[in-house]
Amino acid sequence: MTYCVALRLDKGLLFMSDTRTNAGVDNISTFRKMFTWSVEGDRVITIMTAGNLATTQAVISLLDERSVIPADRKQTLLAAPTMFQVARLVGDTLKEVIHSQAAEGQTAESTFGATIIVGGQIRGMEPRLFLVYPEGNFIEASDETPFFQAGETKYGRPIILRAFDPAMSFEDAIKLLFVSFDSTLKANLAVGMPLDLHAYRIDTFETGIQRRVPSDDPYFHAISSDWGRALKEAIDKLPDFSV
């Protein structure tokens, strides 16, 4: 299982993903689910993947290969003219991989499903954020929906819905995502550390902050402990129910 979140902030884009994959309680591995491509001064693009590991690895490999040796120079992550075209390229590649794997196997296409979050900025345009579905179609983040999640979303979603503000700083947004991930980690063993973090600041066209947060990270554990304590204190302060 996977948990990925991307926030569209006034100051840029923030991405976070876990790294755990599992095929049962006795077969747990760590795989990167966040990938970044950049051309300094021109573009930064980040992709996060959730779903069938073979599918997502094939998609990332194809996108990489076609960026190096493009059949159509405009149809690569490093040359697409807009982020919309980037999202369409990712969707087409995902659909291609799913159809190819289904044709070679004996099971339904849904077995090979995956969902992808793609965001970034190309010079001359605003940062954009998309959620790509297994069918290859996609939606874009907006003022009404300024964040996307993929994978095991239900445990960490209420925290983001209550506290997220696009005007918040990167520091506060990272704290918010740490709380969201902490809630998910405690509720679902299929989501696990380390976490990958990428903060892209608007109009810099540089990769920005990229960090792996290990399971023994002291700041993450401080956030987890302080959040748990603050939640208990908040519950104590709520009015009592009359019985």
Task: List the predicted regions and their residue ranges.
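N-terminal nucleophile
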Residues: 1-243
